[in-house]
Amino acid sequence: MMRRTIYTCYSLLLATVLLPGTTSCTSRCGTVDESRLSYIDTRVGTAPSATHTAGLFGRDTEEYGQTLPAVLEPNGMNFWTAQTRDTEEKCIAPYYYADTLLQGFRNSHWIVGGCTQDYGSMTLMPLFGKLRCQPEARSTRFSHEKETATPAYYTVSLPDENIYAEMTGRSRSAIFRFTYSKAGKGYLVV
């Protein structure tokens, strides 16, 4: 009985000493240093590996890092990414750096770094002029020079659509801004 009382008192003492430090760390650690995000390019790993070792394991999708330019908060429930391939097939990520056509912006559950299958995804695509619903038909050119990809923000210019697209992720949602550079009919395909 005495041992239990000492253990309880010791536990309470530790909790009293450690908890204030934990709460102050949370308030400091909750802020994000925006300048550090500029050093992160989430497109790294979306092109084939150039190393000799990668070739030892295969010459198909295994040579990719299977990453994607996702925007999300840490430990978020979902994330959004640019989509260059309309598939939920095993070992094929929604985005690859070598692709030159963008099909939309995808809410994905892709396991980054793995070779599993995506599931339950949904894609949004802003269009200008003519409504095109099929992924291949709505594909539009984009350039990596007019693309920015960080964990907090993704932007790309879609010159054929006259659209400047921006997105940022939250833990369970995303915020989009589509800026049309010309007057006319604009669409958002879901």
Region annotations inferred by a language model:
Residues M1-T5:
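Positively charged n-region of N-terminal signal peptides that target proteins for export
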